[in-house]
């Protein structure tokens, strides 16, 4: 099944949270937390401005992004992967490695 976001929506596959602390301690359960990073797998056409023009999105497919925890809508598992639908404004940063 394919899913295509509309307008300024972005579909993100959440990256797994690190299971070790910086000091090498293995974290379990809630101590590991949920990552607020993910990989963009699809983007909408853009946001419609007040003047009617279409502004393309700054994020692209393949970008690693940081987003606010708790934002977005969870999508039923598609191809056995849990996905999130976010608006571009929910995304705080693009990670450049």
UniProtKB/Swiss-Prot annotation:
UniProt cross-references to PROSITE patterns, sorted A to Z: CHAPERONINS_CPN10
Stretches of the chain forming a coiled coil according to its record: none
Keywords, comma-separated and alphabetical: Chaperone, Cytoplasm
A Pfam cross-reference name: Cpn10
Any one annotated GO CC term: cytoplasm
Family: Belongs to the GroES chaperonin family.
Annotated protein name in UniProt: Co-chaperonin GroES
Annotated source species: Buchnera aphidicola subsp. Baizongia pistaciae (strain Bp)
Lineage summary: Bacteria, Pseudomonadati, Pseudomonadota, Gammaproteobacteria, Enterobacterales
């Amino acid at each position: 099944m394919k899913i295509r976001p509309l307008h300024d929506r972005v579909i993100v596959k959440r990256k797994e949270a690190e299971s070790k602390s910086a000091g090498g301690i293995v974290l379990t359960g809630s101590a590991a937390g949920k990552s607020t990073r993910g990989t963009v797998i699809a983007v909408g056409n853009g946001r419609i401005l007040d003047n009617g023009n279409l502004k393309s999105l700054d994020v692209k497919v393949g970008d690693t992004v940081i987003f606010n925890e708790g934002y977005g809508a969870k999508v039923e598992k598609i191809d056995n992967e849990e996905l999130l639908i976010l608006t571009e404004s929910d995304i705080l940063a693009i990670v450049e490695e």
